[in-house]
From Swiss-Prot:
Induction: Up-regulated when diet is restricted. Disruption phenotype: Reduced lifespan when diet is restricted, and in the presence of the oxidative stress inducer paraquat. Increased pha-4 and cup-4 expression when diet is restricted. RNAi-mediated knockdown reduces lifespan and resistance to the oxidative stress inducer paraquat. RNAi-mediated knockdown in an eat-2 mutant background rescues lifespan, but lifespan remains greater than in wild-type. Residues 1-22 form the signal peptide. One of its GO terms (biological process) is determination of adult lifespan. May regulate lifespan in response to food availability and oxidative stress. It comes from the Eukaryota. This is Neuropeptide-like protein 7.
């Protein structure tokens, strides 16, 4: 009796998996050549929009960072990388000591020059 019930469960599972896999393969039609092109998912436009070139360029400065700059506690906060009014890492002294710890570091006002102590070691 238990053997018949086990066989019935196996057969029902096999039939159900065959039906669902056939439905899935029918839903995902792999014969469509548009799925294998580099423009799949992009908007198809006959006329491409002209590219707008800027009239003026803004020069940027790329600086190399030393390992001492990684001691900045701003790098460990959740607000790192967001746009805020803060001095850059190059403006901070190498041996800057912060007078507060904890959740105060997440406050952007904490990093203004009036709230820090500088050690001239």
């Amino acid at each position: 009796m238990y053997i018949k019930a086990a066989l019935l469960i196996v057969v029902l599972f096999g039939v159900a998996s065959q039906i669902t896999s056939a439905l899935y393969l029918k839903q995902a039609d792999f014969d469509d050549p548009r799925m294998f092109t580099s423009s799949f998912g992009k908007r198809s436009a006959i006329e491409s929009e002209p590219q707008a070139y800027p009239k003026s360029y803004r020069a940027i400065r790329i600086q190399r960072r030393s390992m001492d700059d990684l001691d900045d506690p701003r790098l460990m906060t959740m607000s790192f990388g967001k746009r805020m009014i803060l001095p850059s890492l190059a403006d901070l002294h190498r041996y800057t000591m912060y007078d507060k710890r904890g959740s105060d570091i997440d406050d952007p006002r904490y990093f203004l020059f009036s709230n820090r102590l500088t050690c001239r070691c």
